[in-house]
Amino acid sequence: MTQQTPDQYRVFGNPIEQSKSPAIHHIFADKSQQNIDYQKQLVDTKDFSNAVADFIRHGGKGANVTAPFKEQALAIADELTERATLAGAVNTLTFKNGKIFGDNTDGEGLVQDLITNKVILNESRVLLLGAGGAARGVLLPLLAQNPRSIVIANRTASKAATLCQHFSDIRLSASGYQDLEQQHFDVIINATSASLSGNLPPIPTSLLSQNVVCYDMVYGKDETPFLKWAKEHGAMKVIDGLGMLVGQAAVSFEVWRGVTPEVQPVIDKLRASLK
């Protein structure tokens, strides 16, 4: 009996060398008996749509998209999910019946990781740090978990206000970092890239207490500066973004293959490889 040719998937980005997506998807495929081949592909910043078209021509079934191409992926999609439209970005493309379908699984990945870590979002007061693409990408799935309120805080408060208007939900409000002093939150999510450069968002330590959960979308071998700071100032629980990375990949895999993969073994494996 001849081995069937595996279905082809890609992750497009620039840079792309650091991507863990191929490893994650191959573990998912292995555990769920799915015959796929998933590779990373470096794409010139001006050549994204050509790279996608070329991949489709060669029989590609789907692709993940990472920086700096998520907005371009949105532009080339023929059809979009609501979460992709509101996120203003696409990280998952499916090629079917001559059409390109765009989705965004980042927010779902975050929410699933919070739930796995037993973080209660229902009726919680959530503080979302940052008003860029990462924050925008997770708002719809966060709102679907029925929080009491979400405050979007940003260095430039007007940018946070614009994001609130974009979603027009009464549970959303905007703030500058300097205006957070007297406020209380149950969950603080860092959607800034500050941790990547070893920095902290300038937020007051008065926000932290024994009842606060702090989540950083960034992850690494060591605890991120934000989580280290949160722990030092008494946060109840700190969680990094590795589970979100695996979670958003799992949702993409499900979109493509119709199979829900187990995420915990993959998180454990990646965590061990970071050590």
From Swiss-Prot:
Pathway: Metabolic intermediate biosynthesis; chorismate biosynthesis; chorismate from D-erythrose 4-phosphate and phosphoenolpyruvate: step 4/7. Homodimer. It is an enzyme of class 1 (oxidoreductase). Shikimate binds at S19, K20, S21, T66, N91, D106, Y219. This is Shikimate dehydrogenase (NADP(+)). NADP(+) binds at E82, G130, A131, G132, G133, A134, N154, R155, T156, A157, S158, K159, M217, G241. The active site is at K70 (proton acceptor). One of its GO terms (molecular function) is shikimate 3-dehydrogenase (NADP+) activity. Gene3D superfamilies: Leucine Dehydrogenase, chain A, domain 1, NAD(P)-binding Rossmann-like Domain. It catalyses: shikimate + NADP(+) = 3-dehydroshikimate + NADPH + H(+). Keywords: Amino-acid biosynthesis, Aromatic amino acid biosynthesis, NADP, Oxidoreductase. Belongs to the shikimate dehydrogenase family. GO terms for biological process: amino acid biosynthetic process; aromatic amino acid family biosynthetic process; chorismate biosynthetic process; shikimate metabolic process. Pfam families: SDH_C, Shikimate_DH, Shikimate_dh_N. NCBIfam families: aroE, PRK00258.1-2. Its EC number is 1.1.1.25. Involved in the biosynthesis of the chorismate, which leads to the biosynthesis of aromatic amino acids. Catalyzes the reversible NADPH linked reduction of 3-dehydroshikimate (DHSA) to yield shikimate (SA). InterPro entries: Aminoacid_DH-like_N_sf, NAD(P)-bd_dom_sf, SDH_C, Shikimate_DH, Shikimate_DH-bd_N, Shikimate_DH_fam, Shikm_DH/Glu-tRNA_Rdtase. SUPFAM superfamilies: Aminoacid dehydrogenase-like, N-terminal domain, NAD(P)-binding Rossmann-fold domains. The gene is aroE. GO terms for cellular component: cytosol.
